Amino acid sequence: MAGSLFDTSAMEKPRILILGGTTEARELARRLAEDVRYDTAISLAGRTADPRPQPVKTRIGGFGGADGLAHFVHDENIALLVDATHPFAARISHNAADAAQRTGVALIALRRPEWVPLPGDRWTAVDSVVEAVSALGDRRRRVFLAIGRQEAFHFEVAPQHSYVIRSVDPVTPPLNLPDQEAILATGPFAEADEAALLRSRQIDVIVAKNSGGSATYGKIAAARRLGIEVIMVERRKPADVPTVGSCDEALNRIAHWLAPA
């Protein structure tokens, strides 16, 4: 079809759409790009100003909710949808499950395993960023805020603390906090570097999301070594869809579902 994201000269190939934005999504796209059996594309939400290049055809921007995604899946004749978005991107995951149900397209979720506390960890588990704000308490603390920029505004109600805020892109609009430092950086972050950062800023508590994976685990390991508390925002219950924990598992599932009849 005109304007298609996919290769219109290869209509016989099953079309796979990856909903991306994670390291795992990019790795899966790279491996699928090397497989001539499939026609693969990836969609990014467009929340970062300078997204990394992808190894397959790329779409950037939202779909307009579950309705828009369902129309796209139908119009592009998608055979398989892979939800490889961030574990905390609950809205797009919900939309993907809804769109798959409406269209009858196969859907799998690629979710990196959660981190689990190890001996020496000082975790305070909370269910939301709002709860994390409350968990800081009233006493002034030196906080390393490592939850991304989208929900950082919640901490404006706790201006008594000192904040070091790390994100890929600047927090906009700027936070109304009297004592804050912004660090713009993209992982992976090594444990030694994270420990040096925590020491230099005299951090006594980290606020993090349980995103799993190795790229941002350095701060968790460094906190364990230094005896620093981590207020851990746990994941919400995922949508009830088939889920795999690695690219290898995803490729096996894809090969099974899209095997020639």
Swiss-Prot record:
Protein name per its UniProtKB record: Precorrin-6A reductase
Family: Belongs to the precorrin-6x reductase family.
Species name: Sinorhizobium sp
Any GO BP annotation: cobalamin biosynthetic process
GO molecular function terms attached to this record: precorrin-6A reductase activity
Primary role: Catalyzes the reduction of the macrocycle of precorrin-6X into precorrin-6Y.
E.C. code: 1.3.1.54
Matching NCBIfam families: precor6x_red (TIGR00715), PRK08057.1-2 (NF005968)
Disulfide feature: none
Catalytic activity: precorrin-6B + NADP(+) = precorrin-6A + NADPH + 2 H(+)
Family matches, as InterPro entries: Precorrin-6x_reduct (IPR003723)
Tree of life domain: Bacteria
Pathway listed: Cofactor biosynthesis; adenosylcobalamin biosynthesis; cob(II)yrinate a,c-diamide from precorrin-2 (aerobic route): step 6/10
Keyword NADP applies: yes
Keywords on record: Cobalamin biosynthesis, NADP, Oxidoreductase
Top class in the EC scheme: oxidoreductase
Keyword Zinc-finger: no
